[in-house]
Amino acid sequence: MEQFRKTMVPHFLTKLWILVDDAVLDHVIRWGKDGHSFQIVNEETFAREVLPKYFKHNKITSFIRQLNMYGSRKVFALQTEKTSQENKISIEFQHPLFKRGEACLLANIKRKVPTIKIEGASLYSDEFQKIVTEMQEFKDMQRKMDAKYTQMKQDYSNLYHEVTNLRKKYCAQQQLLTRVLHFILDLMSENHTVLKKRKRSLSFISEDSDSEWDHQYFRIPEDKKEAMEILKDGYELVEDKYKSLLDRVMPILKESKKLISSGDQPSGDDGEHPKVPVQDKPMNEESLTIQLDLTIPVLPEQITEESVEQEPKDISLELDLSSQDSILMKDKSDNLYNNIINRDKKDMHHTEGNLLELNSLLSRKALNYDSDHFSESLSLMKNEEEKSQLDLSGGKDNHMIQCMETPELFLLDEIPMCDFGENLQDYDRLLEDLKNPPNVISALCDHDYVTSNISTLQEDTIENSIPQLCMEANGESSVFPFLILNPVTNIF
């Protein structure tokens, strides 16, 4: 036993050596004749008595399997007549290092390792190594992807904050741009206004009336850039605070229209030409339309006039009809217009004769005017007549301001115009004849629109607007334009 302790011998070999070397158990297990092998004489007794005591089991097959694992082999002896009976029961095993008297050799006996598993491991070692390498690469790629994902999250967060700031700046810029555009559109879409000091008092108006007019104007909606029918469709679009102004202005226009219509029907003196008709149709709210061109940003020229005593030569001034917005101004007192209408009625019988003379003179000439030449000649005619009238009046307080129509700002659309022909006949003679009547200018002053039948072939009418302007003795005057709108056949 001391020999086994010095060397590392498996317990199975140690127990087997003790059993075989014990002489007491020779009837069960013993050495062979040459000492190079051992024999199990009685298998049943060995399995029943010895195995449970030393190996904790009683299976002879398990014992034989253990011997095979340590390299022991079963010995088959030659069968003879003498030995055949002895070997029927015994089993002999042999190992090169398991010999009688040589216990030191037991340390060299090793348990066999299954070679099949080792060969399988060697075959799959290369593939396993490849798999391990690939797994390592996958792990590296995963780490890199995680790093990229973290960086992308940081970049996304930064971009989100930048986009938020840009949206705030964009909203602020949009608001600023909207305010600027509204400001510009308000400036461009505002109607022309009349300054307070433009209006002066008339001589026949009571002293208690206020000569200064408020700064009133209409605000037309921006989306209505074309003609707007005020009383029919556009009246609903006007702001509430300006509707009262319209309600006061429209009755004045109606009364003035009736007055002028009744006084503008002179009869021919020689019977050659019929009376000059004035379009005297009943004016209703639906037929009265005003066309406003909001796209013209030019403001009306300010009327500046001096008294007759200061500058008598500058009395004739051209007033652009772009000041038609003054018809929309608030009337402070209805008595002002009533006094003007009463004054026109008193002077109507004086102007009838002068209009008849002018009509007969124009009828005798029977000229064919072109529309452009007629407007130019009419302007020259009025200037000459005003100068002659001022010379005859001897510096009276009353003076006239000439209002010329502009083709861009017609109050009515598609007013029928007369075709006065292409050839201008005896133009110098006409001017000389028109200078002789002394009261032609007074006839033109008391009418807003004068219609004359110039051509015998075409019985059309043309209207000329000349507002009446009067002055007081102190030099102050007040402008009250009367714009009478005659109904036409084609309205919008």
Curated annotation (Swiss-Prot):
Gene Ontology biological process: cellular response to heat; positive regulation of transcription by RNA polymerase II
Instruction: Please list where the region (Disordered) is annotated.
Output: 260-282
Q: Which GO terms describe its cellular component?
A: cytoplasm; nucleus
MF GO annotations: chromatin DNA binding; DNA-binding transcription factor activity; sequence-specific DNA binding
Please tell me whether the keyword ATP-binding is annotated for this protein: no
Spans annotated as Required for nuclear translocation in heat-shocked cells: 1-33
Residue ranges of the DNA-binding region?
9-114
Which keywords belong to this entry? Activator, Cytoplasm, DNA-binding, Nucleus, Stress response, Transcription, Transcription regulation
The family annotation for this protein states:
Belongs to the HSF family.
Function recorded in the entry: DNA-binding protein that specifically binds heat shock promoter elements (HSE) and activates transcription of non-classical heat-shock genes such as PDZD2 and PROM2. Protects cells against heat shock and proteotoxic stress.
Any idea what this protein is called? Heat shock factor protein 3
Q: Which organism is it from?
A: Mus musculus (Mouse)
